[in-house]
Amino acid sequence: MSACYLAVDLGAESGRVVLGRFDGERMSLEEVHRFPNLSVRLPDGLHWDVLRILQEIKEGLAKAAREERVEGVGIDSWGVDFGLLDRDGALVSNPYHHRDTRTEGMLDEAFGIVPKEEIYQTTGIQFLPINTLYQLLAMRGTPFFEVAETLLLIPDLINYWLTGEKVCERTNATTTQLVDLRTEEWSKELLARLGLPASLLAPIVPPATELGPLLPEVADELGAAPPVFAVASHDTASAVVAVPARADDFAYISSGTWSLVGVESREPIVTREAMEANFTNEGGFEGTTRFLKNVMGLWILQECRRQWARDGYEYSYEELARLAKDAPSAGPLVDPDHPAFLAPGNMASRVQSFCKRMGQTPPEGPAAIARCVFESLALKYASAIEQAQRLTGRNVGSINVVGGGSRNALLCQLTADASGLPVVAGPVEATAMGNVMVQAFARGRVGSREEIRAVVGDSFETSAYEPGGDADEWSGLYERFSRLIAEAHAVEIPEGG
């Protein structure tokens, strides 16, 4: 008999409530409810509409409970963003969006207090202005911060509203850059030196922790009272759990708005070389470390689509991939991680401005711009995997691409060509699968991440891509891309048109 679990998977563009059925050998997924997840710009900055997110989640849970006996609920989302609660447990304000510009200059401010090397040695986390650490530094002295008693990351905030429990799940907590990687607890020393109160942070719990049943009033509202689990609540952590790899020598790309590119490690790697390469050591399932690099991902193309739609031209991702496939190859390139591409805006114009500023002929039209973005992403992936191999001393035998980007056959093929490694694409729904299977693990239905990966591999089809194309051309393109990244590092790119 199949057990049913609900995975709530929150992404930067949309959220979903997914019903997972697991019979002990195979699993299946059914999307119960989907809703847009849009940021809201207020006078004080860019925010998430977290109350609407909660209401949409409740609607999805109620729908599922009418159809099935649900044995568990788990929440996953992106990292770093958080809500603040006052002493009565009330939300102080809608959470800020990590793309809000208030963190500009906060890295330098932090390094003026605690040297960069010490922060990395303590936390092992990549330096990004979006990290919770820098968001908190930017909030010091604000009325919101002054009345805050508890900080909860987005999945933990939802869990609190469902169960009343205030905890921070470990895989997501590590993204804050405030966790001591040796003790797996909040670094009280780092917090004290930065002038941030350790009392703000809730206790850390490992994935597969049962938080308890729904609050009585929530259970009455939804017509069910399933237990809630702290799963691997960082969406990439859930996705990596569900990578259907049969051997340990795989690299992964969790491909969506962000692309997270890396390997699974038993120990964190905090060498100077890892810090200078801006690799991160995020928490994984069963005590593993996700040694990876954050790459801007499909965000650039998402923003291009929004701009083109505003201009009256609607393109699906599938249409853009078809157009890009027929566009000339080995053309202009961009560094997807350049600061010019972080904030929302006219991204097509920024791509053109970047190319022009770097002495390249700017791409004209959606086909050429999409080709530029796809080739640049593939080269960035190849670069990150080459770095991961060098930093870990391990050889990678294949690349597993999971998430929405695994549907993009062109990007997968370009990744195989650029890296010279075979690519296995899928499953698309790896995050929801990992969420469901960690709940099954908590219930004792599976015993390890290896068993979970075998279940996923037996339950869902994947696609294979072998390296092809002109190897010499790709080698030259890789060298040109590497030079471009080095030269663009200190270059300011104007917004353009």
Q: What do these predicted ranges mean?
A:
Residues 38-41, 123-132, 174-178, 199-207, ...:
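A glycine-/small-polar-enriched, mobile loop at the entrance of the PLP active site in fold-type I
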Residues 100:
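Carbohydrate-associated surface elements
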Residues 69-77, 150, 203, 391-403:
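Short glycine-rich phosphate-binding loop at a beta-alpha junction
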Residues 6-7, 19, 111-123, 129, ...:
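Active-site core segments that coordinate phosphate-bearing ligands/cofactors
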Residues 11-13, 69-71, 76-78, 132, ...:
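Short, basic and Ser/Thr-rich N-terminal targeting/leader segments
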Residues 1-93, 121, 203, 219-228, ...:
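N-terminal glycine/serine-rich phosphate-binding loop of ATP-dependent small-molecule kinases
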Residues 164-173:
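Enzymes and membrane/adaptor proteins characterized by extended Gly/Ser/Thr/Asp/Glu-rich
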Residues 76-80, 207-208, 255-258, 398-406:
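Glycine-rich beta-strand-to-loop/alpha-helix junction loops that act as flexible
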